[in-house]
Amino acid sequence: MVQLKAEIDAGPLDNSISIFSLIENGLRQKPDAPAVICLHESADALDHLIVPSNPRERERGPADGECLMLSYRQLHHTAVKLAVGFRAKGVAPGSTLLMLVPNGGHYALLLWACILARLTFISVDPAEVLDDLKSQRIASILQETRPEVVVIPSVIEAKAMDGILGATSITELLKISLKKVQEPGWERMTKLVSDGIANPLDMDALVEEARCDDPDRLYSIMFTSGTSERPKGCPLRVGGAAHMVRSWSWLINQINSSYALQQAHNSRGIAPAQTVQTWAEGGAVVMTGRGFDVDDMLDAIRLNYASFVVLTPAMAHALAAHLETHQIDMSSVKTVQVGGDAVTKNVLVKCNSLFPHADVCINHGMTEGGACFEWSFLDIAPSDVPFFGQICPVGKTARGAAVRIWDTEREEIAERGRPGQLHLSSESIIRHYLHGESAGSFYQQGGQRWFITGDIAMMTDEGTVYILGRSKDTIVSDGHLVMPFVIESCLEDLTGSQASVIAIPHPVYGQVPYAVLQTLKQVDDHAIQDQVVRLLGTDYQLAGINSLEALGMTTVPVNDTRKIIKSQIKEAVMRYIDGK
């Protein structure tokens, strides 16, 4: 019998369109519908920038007048003035803008203006400017990207940025502040909009140029989280960003885009992608002020301002705990996207029970790009999804992408059903890291550009793909590859408790897996270890099981995007073992 190879090319995707042409759909279809709703900003927060709409023209929302709400018409007209203001200051198409701004109305205006003015945008969390350790990263970004424009929130960040700039060789820079700043050399964003109003530049010509944007122009540079290594710059082309929007039309659509809740900060790749995807469908981007915060999400749901939400597994667990003591109507939520970390069957089923009226799906994405998989299980119950043990699939190969599982031992495409390195090819994936860093992560073959993701994955005979974990997280125990996520999903199924598995050193086997559970109450750790071996085999024998409490931790440590920080868990485990 001939074994199928684990590679699928799903064929081309029509992508002959610019980013502005995509978001212009919302402007044309619903000019007076809300494009941006900021629950954490007052209704008059941008009155100094925005020309108020006629209240009879603008569609009203559940909390109209209580928070900032911009219509497509308001957003576009103001962004045009801002784009012209940039041009009046000598900022030409192809220039780079570094924005360090919180989620909110200013971010939305800057993003729309960058698309109109054809500027490359870089987003960084403004808190990093004020952090002595992270400010070094800002200096590196400035030196590596040489932006023509930098935008910060207020005087505090302006002073810090001046200090950082003083340590670089950058001298020519347009410095913009969202609020009034007395520091020399800084201009308020309001002044740029005023300059745009007074400038005779043909605004219609600017819009037409945006419609015909060069697909090879650099659209954005986002930086990887740097959880385990130095952050790498990911330069995404206009054509790649447009490809992502076209491919994700199954994810955010006319049905669920009315109020698409965006909690990730705009420095995370998921945020601008979701913003543009929502605008392309004529929906409203709903923003909150505290990142992936469960309370903020629930506030949005109570106000009926959340038809589309994004959850990480850690958030799903926190939300479930909250809803045990609080009753909230979740019927306004139409779609729940789960991702950010590996997703188990329990998490998917739990999300379905938390949001009984919603479609629950997984969407795979990376800072380097996305749109390589399509969730093909929307028409079936989450419990009937074809799981691999307790592991959820990421879907099947999406149109416009090719997926390959690579056998590193044999140096060939793996057979289906066998794990290997996940390699992806798509227009939506960057062609290289900034300045050619980690060049070995990319290769050219058969007329296609491939990206080595760093994930270990498996493809079934039906073409369904499962990501088993990160290559860097793989535990090599006595010469055998052990995937922590496989054990974590098994433990969560057996105990109902959130689990994290890390590697600890062993004098004979090199490494062995060690598990940390949210709680060990009503758990027989020895019996659980025996069950893990019985279900997964002797390669998965645990060196021990412990609870967060025993390690001196109260909660699972997560980063800004709610991904678990395993390095902190490992440090706590090693302290515990050394102290015994």
From Swiss-Prot:
It is an enzyme of class 6 (ligase). It comes from the Eukaryota. One of its GO terms (biological process) is fatty acid metabolic process. Induction: The expression of the dibenzodioxocinones biosynthesis cluster is positively regulated by the transcription factor dibT. Keywords: ATP-binding, Ligase, Nucleotide-binding. Belongs to the ATP-dependent AMP-binding enzyme family. This is Acyl--CoA ligase GME11374.
